[in-house]
Amino acid sequence: MQDFTIESLDAKEVLTYRHEFAATPQEIYNAFIDPKLFIKWFGPKDWNVVPNTLTLEPVNGGRKQFVMKHRHNPKFQAPMYMRFIAMKEPELLEYREALPTPQGQPSDTLVALRIELEEGTAITEDGVGKGTILKLTQGPLPQEVHEQTLTSWKDSFVGLTKLLDASK
């Protein structure tokens, strides 16, 4: 697997998204690296992480691997194979995901994912206040899948918001 930097990618193939949370950067960072929290929120609508498939080693070079299963049709599954390549608590998580082959094994095709967390003023459904601005950068992704990918992330962040609100 050949590595690359997000900055070296064609801008048309890079998805960027900004989301604001009424939570601290540390709380959000923990939700990405704590297995007990991660399985509660991650996944697009109607998809769940299968808990016993999760391997989460939150160190540079560590693995983040799991299978997501469709809630209404369990025959639909999606394996995920990632490696942490950069971590700076509670500000940065960066992965490289090896896309699965048709047989469900990791391939040599890599996609980068960077999550940056910055404390600041957040505007949420509850109003304006102290919170965290999350900046997501992902690619290379063909432009045709940007909308679907963004919808999946927004669905996941609805779950993360519910988890964070429940812990208050």
Regions found by a protein language model. Give the residues of each.
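Short amphipathic alpha-helical signal-transduction/dimerization elements
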Residues: 157-168
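Intrinsic-disorder/low-complexity, polar/charged segments enriched in Ser/Thr/Lys/Arg/Asp/Glu/Gln
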Residues: 12-18, 25-27, 63, 79, ...
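Hydrophobic pocket/interface hotspot
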Residues: 28-29, 38, 64, 84, ...
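Short beta-edge strand/loop motif at the mouth of beta-sheet-based domains
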Residues: 16-17, 36-77
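Hydrophobic ligand-binding cavity/cleft-lining segments
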Residues: 1-49
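Beta-strand/loop substructures that line and gate deep hydrophobic ligand-binding cavities in soluble
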Residues: 94-154
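Hydrophobic/aromatic beta-strand elements that line small-molecule binding cavities or substrate pockets
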Residues: 19, 53-54, 79-86, 110-125
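A generic structural micro-feature
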Residues: 9-11, 56, 74-78, 105-109, ...
